[in-house]
């Protein structure tokens, strides 16, 4: 009852409004009289006389501007009071607007006394021409309007036969009548009583929700049946495996006592381990008494996963796409950006995704090669929050792929726009996250990294990280990872030296943050900047060693090891010769082979299609289908079976997405095929000089190029560089491992520089994003930030912070390096 009383006035007002709209005059009088007698207040509704009078005033103003030929006043009122959904979505409104533009373009020609003012006429014609090139372009394929596209270019339209009807006396009054009818229709629609609107919207909304829920239920039931079958099979296999394991343990105990295992028993055990389809045939066709037969058959029973024959996606009409991205409504732009991103993120890794990306690049989808003032890239500064966010998501998706980064890097304005958006965006957290993610991946390319340092991005990052509790997990992790990447460069360290106290305080505070995913990046940044003498002095003055030792007491073994080497760096004196030479040359900027598509790219979608509205791939293939021009592009592949050991150090800046997926996404590098073949066979060998030259240039000779990029750069003899400062003498995968010379000893504390380098090897030739960090080193003459590749395709990454410590303890094929 309390709720009714609270809203009684509004409810009674809705009833009164509806009775008035439906012309129940007697009922309305009785209703109003009874409300007055009972003392019930009647709320004045939006649909009252005030709204009617306002609507009439607007109509009169529009008609007056039409009669006077006042183009600016008319279209200002038109855009202010006619909703964009009607202007852009209603075909009659679009056609009427086209003819209205013609009316104002020829107004002076029709109604001027004497010769019209040339300057004013040129201005009106120019306005019409601009309309034809922008919003009016949507009607260019309509036969009815096609002749009028030549109107701005005809010297004297009054005598031209194509435009004869425009200058007839009846044309303007007929157009005016259409305008008045349209305005009356719009006014009536806007005067629909609120009670009726609520009823319609509620019923339609419930119907749509019910339909969606039903579809979801059917899909969920289908999946649950599939999963139940898989679960039952896995459970049966598990019980069978436990039973066989128990018997094998008993048999092993029996052999210790001297009892022999019979061939028949061995055969029965092996058959039980195979799938049902193979059991009967194997029982009679395979001799398990031969040594090695049983184990070989068991391994062979694990059938290799057959690669699906994934079809290429249909080609698109990119000219039409780009035109609508620039000139379409904000809602259409958002749906197109979403569909283009989905095509990239949901495509199958491999040929399908590569073909999609190559089509985008070859058609210059983002206008990176264009110098036009109006380009797709400008959507990053759209007034629409949704368009701005979806543009940032698409750029982040491009930046997640090596070829995409190369494409974006062609236009220097892209980096400037992203940096500007990062610093200005304060409304939309997801937009800011995607811009930050793209910039973090941009730091894989050295020229872009240099530009970011010069633009003062380090100062912005440090300022943001002063209050990490206000940041999302994604923003925190990518900010720290980007800061670490920039701190690996000499110029980056020099920037940090300008605000050494603040940088050290921020990093020391982050050491104790609850998000453990950021620890490797914080440690890497600390170790790197402490190679600068002035920063070491500042750190000693603020008692950094005591702060670090507090974390030694609380941290795990891996964290303790990292901090111990940071302390050794803190207490070290001048570094050996060669360490201080600049690493800021731009001569090596190759592409890396692994690409990561994060799950975050498609999270929390802002727009959903209404009933009958197209979206995603259906929108692209229905409205923008092009000529079939897709061709597969052979792509370099990473090294198979190369992983990182928990005993290996963080060797290069890496990608947060790749870090969690179990393989490094590292700095941009290419690999010759010969090295890849040897690496796959598990025999690291010395890299031939010819191959090394090709590798340095990043020019693979075959599509199957794959290798641990740790072989790419050879450190100078006797040179010691801390992780974050140097190149690892990477054992090249084409020969026997190199034998390192004895590392020089650090004069400050008696620790060999080789030992220090073993904990931090991080100077990248081209830094990468922070997803594959590890800190325990191989013993080598001079450790380096060396990328390691896996041949597995990109996988969905979890949100930063959701898998704490997933970066640690990864098995490695590098543990044999000595």
UniProtKB/Swiss-Prot annotation:
Residues 204-230 form a coiled coil. Residues 642-755, 790-818 are annotated as: Disordered. SMART domains: LisH (SM00667). Induction: Up-regulated in response to serum starvation in fibroblasts. Its main location: cytoplasm. Residues 7-39 form the LisH domain. Residues 701-711 have a biased composition (Low complexity). The keyword Cytoplasm applies. It is found in: Cytoplasm, Cytoskeleton, Cilium basal body; Cell projection, Cilium; Cytoplasm, Cytoskeleton, Microtubule organizing center, Centrosome, Centriole. It is linked to Joubert syndrome 30: A form of Joubert syndrome, a disorder presenting with cerebellar ataxia, oculomotor apraxia, hypotonia, neonatal breathing abnormalities and psychomotor delay. Neuroradiologically, it is characterized by cerebellar vermian hypoplasia/aplasia, thickened and reoriented superior cerebellar peduncles, and an abnormally large interpeduncular fossa, giving the appearance of a molar tooth on transaxial slices (molar tooth sign). Additional variable features include retinal dystrophy, renal disease, liver fibrosis, and polydactyly. JBTS30 inheritance is autosomal recessive. The modification Phosphoserine is found at residue 582. InterPro entries: ARM-like (IPR011989), ARM-type_fold (IPR016024), ARMC9 (IPR040369), ARMC9_ARM_dom (IPR048959), ARMC9_CTLH-like_dom (IPR056327), ARMC9_LisH (IPR048957), LisH (IPR006594). Gene3D superfamilies: Leucine-rich Repeat Variant (1.25.10.10). Involved in ciliogenesis. It is required for appropriate acetylation and polyglutamylation of ciliary microtubules, and regulation of cilium length. Acts as a positive regulator of hedgehog (Hh)signaling. May participate in the trafficking and/or retention of GLI2 and GLI3 proteins at the ciliary tip. Interacts with TOGARAM1, CCDC66, CEP104, CSPP1 and CEP290. Interacts with NDUFAF2. It comes from Homo sapiens (Human). The keyword Protein transport does not apply. Residues 792-818 have a biased composition (Polar residues). Keywords: Cell projection, Ciliopathy, Cilium biogenesis/degradation, Coiled coil, Cytoplasm, Cytoskeleton, Joubert syndrome, Phosphoprotein. Strongly expressed in most melanomas and melanocytes. Weakly expressed in the testis. GO terms for biological process: cilium assembly; positive regulation of smoothened signaling pathway. This is LisH domain-containing protein ARMC9. GO terms for cellular component: centriole; ciliary basal body; ciliary tip; cytoplasm; extracellular exosome.
């Amino acid at each position: 009852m309390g709720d009714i009383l609270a809203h009684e006035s509004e409810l009674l007002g809705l009833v009164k409004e509806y009775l008035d709209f439906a012309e129940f005059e007697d009922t309305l009088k009785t209703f109003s009289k009874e409300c007055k007698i009972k003392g019930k207040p009647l709320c004045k509704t939006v649909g009252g006389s005030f709204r009617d009078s306002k609507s009439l005033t607007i109509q009169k103003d529009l008609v007056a501007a039409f009669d006077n030929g006042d183009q600016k006043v008319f279209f200002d009122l038109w855009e202010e009071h006619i909703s964009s959904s009607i202007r852009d979505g209603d075909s009659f409104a679009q056609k009427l607007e086209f003819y209205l533009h013609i009316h104002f373009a020829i107004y002076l020609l029709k109604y001027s006394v004497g010769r019209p003012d040339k300057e004013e006429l040129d201005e009106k014609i120019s306005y019409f021409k601009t309309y034809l090139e922008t919003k009016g372009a949507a009607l260019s394929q309509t036969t009815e309007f096609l002749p009028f596209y030549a109107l701005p270019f005809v010297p004297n339209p009054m005598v031209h036969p194509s435009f004869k009807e425009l200058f007839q006396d009846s044309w303007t009054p007929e157009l005016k009548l259409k305008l008045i009818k349209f305005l009356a229709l719009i006014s009536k629609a806007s005067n629909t009583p609120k009670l009726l609107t609520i009823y319609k919207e509620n019923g339609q909304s419930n119907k749509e929700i019910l339909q969606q829920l039903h579809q979801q239920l059917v899909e969920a039931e289908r999946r649950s049946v599939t999963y139940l079958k898989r679960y039952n099979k896995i459970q049966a296999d598990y019980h069978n495996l436990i039973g066989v394991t128990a018997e094998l343990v008993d048999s092993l105990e029996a052999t210790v006592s001297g009892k022999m295992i019979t061939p028949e028993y061995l055969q029965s055990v092996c058959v039980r381990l195979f799938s049902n389809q193979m059991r009967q045939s194997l029982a009679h066709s395979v001799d398990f008494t031969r040594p090695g037969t049983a184990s070989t058959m068991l391994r062979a029973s694990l059938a290799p996963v057959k690669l699906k024959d994934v079809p290429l996606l249909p080609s698109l009409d990119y000219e039409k796409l780009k035109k609508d991205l620039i000139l379409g409504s904000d809602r259409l732009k958002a749906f197109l950006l979403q569909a283009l991103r989905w095509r990239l993120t949901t495509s199958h890794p491999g040929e399908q995704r590569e073909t999609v990306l190559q089509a985008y690049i070859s058609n210059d989808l983002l206008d990176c090669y264009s110098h036009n003032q109006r380009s797709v890239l400008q959507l990053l500064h759209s007034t629409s929050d949704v368009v701005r966010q979806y543009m940032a998501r698409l750029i982040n998706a491009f930046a997640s792929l090596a070829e995409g980064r190369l494409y974006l890097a062609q236009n220097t304005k892209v980096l400037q726009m992203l940096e500007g958006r990062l610093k200005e965006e304060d409304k939309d957290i997801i937009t800011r996250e995607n811009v930050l993610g793209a910039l973090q991946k941009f730091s894989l390319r050295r020229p872009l990294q240099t530009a970011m340092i010069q633009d003062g991005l380090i100062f912005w990052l440090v300022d943001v990280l002063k209050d990490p509790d206000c940041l999302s997990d994604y923003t925190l992790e990518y900010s720290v990872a980007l800061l670490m990447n920039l701190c690996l460069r000499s110029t980056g360290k020099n920037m940090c030296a300008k605000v050494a106290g603040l940088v050290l305080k921020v990093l020391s505070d982050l050491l104790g943050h609850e998000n453990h995913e950021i620890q490797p990046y914080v440690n890497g940044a600390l170790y790197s900047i402490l190679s600068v003498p002035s920063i070491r002095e500042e750190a000693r003055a603020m008692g950094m060693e005591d702060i670090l030792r507090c974390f030694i007491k609380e941290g795990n073994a891996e964290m303790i090891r990292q901090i111990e080497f940071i302390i050794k760096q803190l207490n070290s004196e001048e570094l050996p010769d060669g360490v201080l030479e600049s690493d800021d040359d731009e001569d090596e900027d190759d592409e890396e082979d692994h690409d990561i598509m994060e799950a975050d790219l498609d999270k929390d979608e802002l727009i959903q299609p209404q009933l009958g509205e197209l979206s995603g791939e259906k929108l692209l293939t229905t409205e923008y289908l092009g000529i079939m021009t897709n061709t597969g592009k052979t792509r370099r592949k990473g090294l198979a079976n190369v992983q990182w050991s928990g005993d290996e150090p963080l060797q290069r800046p890496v990608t947060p997405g790749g870090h969690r997926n179990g393989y490094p996404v590292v700095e941009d590098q290419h690999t010759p095929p010969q090295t890849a073949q040897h690496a796959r066979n598990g025999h690291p060998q010395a890299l031939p000089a010819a191959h090394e030259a090709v590798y340095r240039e990043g020019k693979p000779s075959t599509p199957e190029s794959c290798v641990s990029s740790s072989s790419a750069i050879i450190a100078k003899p006797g040179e010691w560089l801390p992780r974050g400062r140097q190149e690892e003498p990477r054992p090249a995968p084409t020969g026997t491992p190199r034998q390192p010379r004895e590392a020089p000893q650090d004069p400050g504390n008696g620790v060999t520089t080789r030992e220090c380098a073993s904990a931090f090897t991080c100077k990248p030739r081209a830094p990468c994003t922070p997803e594959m960090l590890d800190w325990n080193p191989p013993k080598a003459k001079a450790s380096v930030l060396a990328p390691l590749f896996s041949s597995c395709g990109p996988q969905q990454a979890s949100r930063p912070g959701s898998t704490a410590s997933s970066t640690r303890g990864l098995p490695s094929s590098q543990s044999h390096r000595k």
